[in-house]
């Protein structure tokens, strides 16, 4: 999603804190994670796709299913996505509709931006840590693979949602830790 942190005054607060306050102040729509994706999460087709994509051998499909079945109640309880729409306050994003023939002030067209957050919940992290602490590294990796695939499908579902219900499109996604403006340290604030 196009998240323009440069539009905010962040002298004393991190960009994540400003984003969180802004989303709270505005009408933020929070939804349970895409139900259709959760329904297919433990299906043979989904699990086989994860097995092939992440190069597990055929004999590991039962372990993948076991981990997915352990993850599902956590996902159903905690996974969500949230969105908030806001007008651009940065004049570099303002466009004019042209000068009127009668010399009147041109209309200003403000671009609308949307901030979105998507999470599978803290319980997935706890499950992965639990496997790791018990030395069950394969199961820990399976959690990572299943979560990654589910999030990728969530991004696709969100793209389709935006296209179907708004006049906007997803320009880009930003991930904490992937660029200087979005340090990994902002995660607890989101």
Model-flagged regions — what are they?
Residues 61, 77-86, 160-176:
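Flexible, glycine/charged-enriched surface loops at secondary-structure junctions
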Residues 137-156, 160:
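Compact, glycine/acidic-enriched structural inserts
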